[in-house]
């Protein structure tokens, strides 16, 4: 991953041209990051992005163990379920494009967060009551699928709040996303007494904070 990141950096520096006119460019400085962090609207939406990402990583980090070791799925069936949820993210992205023609991003974001929170709560209830498969799989799908709408719209709204510092805003959001994802992944195995409950608790917790 470090090698890929280094290659991406080199391509960005030496291959991809800057498209913004020189007169509109903002010099890179730590002051730009400070200004971005001081903007409350940006911070609010950046936290939505971060905790939405954390919810997804709670699912990613635990799903293999929960479905194969606890629920007894074969590797092939687990791959099918995991792939279906990944397809759900693609469907959510396509749906978001259509919805933006009719509704404001903030309204779509609100509904997506509610769906994600309700579905994550059902995942937790299933984990606490013995993992009935069909409700669990359906709830998991609808806990993951809205993340495309959440991440896309929250990112757009966050950057819109600091248009002149869009690059710094993207950097701050990227840092926050992976910081929260890195923190939530070990928590899955530390709370609730089992990875299934831990996954549900972390998904619900992240979703609730994102809604707030």
Name every feature range the model reports, one short phrase each.
Residues 2-22:
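C-terminal membrane-cytosol helix-exit motif in multi-pass small-molecule transporters
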Residues 17-48:
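Juxtamembrane intracellular "pre-TM" segments in multi-pass secondary transporters
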Residues 38-58, 141, 145:
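Pair of pore-lining "gating" transmembrane helices in MFS-fold secondary transporters
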Residues 62-77:
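Short amphipathic helix-loop junctions that connect adjacent transmembrane helices
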Residues 75-83, 170-171, 200:
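Small-residue hotspots at the loop-to-helix junctions and early N-terminal turns
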Residues 92-106:
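Helix-to-loop junctions at the C-terminal end of transmembrane segments
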Residues 107-154:
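C-terminal transmembrane helical hairpin of 12-TM major facilitator-type secondary transporters
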Residues 157-197, 202-203:
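A late C-terminal transmembrane helix in Major Facilitator Superfamily
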